[in-house]
C-alpha cells in the first residue's frame, strides 16, 4: 500500500510539473495534435502520451527528430519545435 501511495504521489508531481504535460493517450504521432508527438512513458514503453514538442532549453533526444514518426516512438522525449535543434549541452541534449 505504501508503494502504491508513493506511485500516485509521483504521478501527480510529474503530471503537474512543467516537463510532463500529458495531453492524451496515443499509439503514433499522427494521433496527436499539431505541436505534439506520441512519446513513450518513462515507466513503460508500451504506454504513450501526446506530449508537446521541445522548447528552447528543454531536454531532447538526438535521434528523435522526425515528426510525424512512422513507427512507435521509443523515447519519452519529443523532438524540438520547428527552428530548434537538439544539441549536446554539458551532459544532456537540449533544444536550442
From Swiss-Prot:
GO biological process terms, semicolon-separated: endothelial cell proliferation
SUPFAM superfamilies: Colipase-like
Signal peptide positions (record): 1-19
Database matches in InterPro entries: Prokineticin, Prokineticin_domain
Pfam families (alphabetical): Prokineticin
Amino-acid biosynthesis as UniProt keyword: no
Single GO term (MF): toxin activity
Tissue-specific expression: Expressed by the skin glands.
Top-level taxonomic group: Eukaryota
Disulfide linkage: 26-38, 32-50, 37-78, 60-86, 80-95
Assigned keywords, A-Z: Disulfide bond, G-protein coupled receptor impairing toxin, Secreted, Signal, Toxin
GO cellular component: a single term: extracellular region
Localisation: Secreted
Family that this chain belongs to: Belongs to the AVIT (prokineticin) family.
Protein's job: Potent agonist for both PKR1/PROKR1 and PKR2/PROKR2, and inducer of a potent and long-lasting hyperalgesia. Also potentiates capsaicin-induced TRPV1 current, when tested on DRG neurons. At subnanomolar concentrations, this protein both induces potent chemotaxis of macrophages and stimulates LPS-induced production of the pro-inflammatory cytokines IL-1 and IL-12. In vivo, potently stimulates the contraction of the guinea-pig gastrointestinal (GI) smooth muscle (nanomolar concentration).
Stored PANTHER family: PROKINETICIN, PROKINETICIN-1
This protein's name: Prokineticin Bo8
Native source species: Bombina orientalis
Lineage: Eukaryota, Metazoa, Chordata, Craniata, Vertebrata
